[in-house]
Amino acid sequence: MSALRGLRILVVENDEMNATLLELQLAQAGAAVIGPAESVRQALALIEQERPDRAVLDFRLAAGETSEAVARMLTEHAIPYVLATGVAAESLPPGFAAGVVLTKPYLSEQLIKALGDAHAKMTARP
């Protein structure tokens, strides 16, 4: 599977097992993985330093943080992202509106499709 070949994808996930699984899914699809970032601070630094092509975020991070500030920065830089979460889409803050919500658990094919949908959504923005 090479659906993501050549793409550099930032992973923002504080759970080690989830991060490892996500990295494996992305690598098997041909992506180069950046991260994982476990905190907002790490994620913001990686966005500035690495300029990823796309990103996959978890909603809840370490120390009670959420990834909303990360989503805002990705939107400012026109970087498409997927919010992979167990939180219901209708209860998410508006800061995630530019991304695509993918409900956990999900299959690799659903992740790849969501990343494509995120790209289409971001490029369609005015």
What do the predicted segments below correspond to?
Residues 84-85:
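Hydrophobic/aromatic residues positioned on beta-strands within the core alpha/beta folds
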Residues 16-35:
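Two-component/phosphorelay signaling modules centered on CheY-like receiver
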